[in-house]
Amino acid sequence: MQEVRAKKALGQHFLTDENIARRIAGALSGGGDVLEVGCGTGMLTQFLLERTDITLYGAEVDGESIGFLHSRFPDFAPRLYDGDFLRMPLREMFPGGVKVIGNFPYNISSQIFFKILENRDLVPESVGMVQKEVAVRLAESPGSRDYGILSVLLQAWYDIEYLFTVHEHVFNPPPKVKSAVIRLRRNGTRALGCDEALFVRVVKAAFSQRRKMLKNPLKAVFGDFGGAEHPWFTRRAETLSVAEFVELTRWVEVHGTVR
């Protein structure tokens, strides 16, 4: 089989360490359908296929990788989708739900997590390798400079675990930064107790000017609130917990200009 060349435009850095691939595959709980995003050379795929407690599917956009994977895992070929995960109709393809795993392409890792969020009722769990700084940011707590939009949104519906750090030398080509593996598991939250679409808007607005007090970015998006002032308006977005953002969303719904 011809070797697959990593393509910079696709954000590809192929994992070469079998022990790490085995750890990633083992970090996912058993049962149900599993979708691997970006199968690459099949380093992780081989250990997922060894698991008899899951049904593995794959998503890959690189034609060279797809040809390689078809040759290496012919029985897996019918479940390997030639297409972009970000465009996949998960609700149609996996109406019973699907877990998501992968060595996520670094250039779209944040978009992958937003896709998971949009399908949170379908995705009970995800294990992904991303840039270390992204993993830290997602798992961060309020009060940290790394705490941001995805931190709040993911933590609203998922418990996030930083599992382990992965060094540069176990990839081909080696990335310029360290990587990390994180695990997302749906928490007990089924409804936030506020307008969830508005919650997302409030969080994004609050962090749009993260170094300023909340009143500035929120008034820019939702108007002057009829002159009303929330007691948290003097705080910054990075200091609010998920529960506080939920409460703030309820307040904005009552006092703001919501379109």
Language model features: what each stretch is:
Residues 1-205, 243-259:
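Catalytic cores of RNA-modifying enzymes
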Residues 205-259:
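C-terminal lobe and adjacent flexible extensions of AdoMet/dcAdoMet transferase-like proteins
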